[in-house]
């Protein structure tokens, strides 16, 4: 028996001819809450409240551009035939790894120009970035994307999910695994872990590197469940390769900075 389930409307409201999508609203909300958290911790760490406001004004647009460019590059076979869709980011298609590249490069340049420690900024921003990612995945939910393989409704009900999530996972006559939810929950858990680790007084830069490891671990396993992965080869998922590289590099950098002998400031030091 075929079911008739209407998906949630991806458009929040209209401003004349302009459609405002939930995808953009949710990503914007994640960015604002992340900024609030960073400003609050930055002030506690002796930084002016405008430090992160100014940084975000540069980092967000650059991160979005890099996230889109990353996605388009690895889907060039499609976009070369549909160039008019390259700018249609409201329909999805922002790669988190691309966004991180843009954000990190912006942070490095910003820190150098302002005479600040990049590692200090990165540590403070780490929980905020992960919070933004956790919230942003719900934009994928509204667009019915970033899901996993086909499953039964009973499978989703056994996860004790609310009906609005189960129904939104009904796409073209089939239910799918809510991998967006798995990653969102993993990221929310990571935010709590990072906030607790701030009290451990790690060496400067280690909180950010732990964020990289945490996110990459979750992304590696969850990516294996997805059906819309960007592929490097027929059987090789780009996000999984990048995740492994990031885990190894972050762990190696932590070890190198701890054992090279030079004194490195602690997180709690101004």
From Swiss-Prot:
Main location: membrane
Family: Belongs to the Lgt family.
PROSITE patterns: LGT (PS01311)
Localization of this protein: Cell membrane
Keywords from the UniProt entry: Cell membrane, Membrane, Transferase, Transmembrane, Transmembrane helix
A GO molecular-function annotation: phosphatidylglycerol-prolipoprotein diacylglyceryl transferase activity
Biological source species: Bacillus licheniformis (strain ATCC 14580 / DSM 13 / JCM 2505 / CCUG 7422 / NBRC 12200 / NCIMB 9375 / NCTC 10341 / NRRL NRS-1264 / Gibson 46)
Purpose: Catalyzes the transfer of the diacylglyceryl group from phosphatidylglycerol to the sulfhydryl group of the N-terminal cysteine of a prolipoprotein, the first step in the formation of mature lipoproteins.
Positions contributing to a 1,2-diacyl-sn-glycero-3-phospho-(1'-sn-glycerol) binding: 137
Name recorded for this polypeptide: Phosphatidylglycerol--prolipoprotein diacylglyceryl transferase
InterPro entries noted in UniProt: Lgt
HAMAP family registered for this protein in UniProt: Lgt
Class of the enzyme per the UniProt entry, highest EC level: transferase
Pfam families from the UniProt entry: LGT
């Amino acid at each position: 028996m075929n079911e008739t389930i209407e998906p949630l409307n991806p458009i929040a409201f209209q401003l004349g001819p302009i459609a405002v999508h939930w995808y953009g609203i949710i990503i914007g909300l994640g960015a604002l809450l992340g900024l609030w958290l960073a400003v609050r911790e930055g002030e506690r760490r002796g930084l002016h409240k405008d430090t992160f406001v100014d940084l975000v004004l540069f980092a967000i647009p650059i991160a979005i551009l890099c996230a889109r460019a990353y996605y388009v590059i690895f889907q060039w076979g499609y976009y070369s035939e549909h160039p008019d869709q390259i700018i249609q980011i409201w329909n999805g298609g922002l790669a988190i790894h691309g966004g991180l590249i843009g954000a990190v490069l912006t942070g490095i340049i910003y820190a150098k120009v302002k005479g600040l420690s990049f590692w200090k900024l990165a540590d403070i921003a780490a929980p905020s970035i992960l919070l933004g990612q956790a919230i942003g995945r719900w934009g994928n939910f509204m667009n019915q994307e970033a899901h996993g393989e086909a499953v039964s409704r009973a499978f989703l009900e056994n996860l004790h999910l609310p009906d609005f999530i189960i129904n939104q996972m009904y796409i073209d006559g089939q239910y799918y695994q809510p991998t967006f939810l798995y990653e969102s929950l993993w990221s929310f858990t990571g935010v709590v872990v990072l906030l607790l680790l701030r009290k451990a007084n790690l060496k400067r830069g280690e909180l950010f590197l732990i964020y990289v490891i945490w996110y990459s671990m979750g992304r590696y396993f969850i990516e294996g469940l997805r059906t819309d992965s960007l592929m490097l080869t027929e059987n090789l998922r780009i996000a999984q390769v990048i995740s492994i590289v990031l885990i190894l590099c972050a762990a190696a950098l932590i070890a190198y900075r701890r054992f090279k002998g030079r004194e490195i400031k602690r997180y709690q030091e101004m």
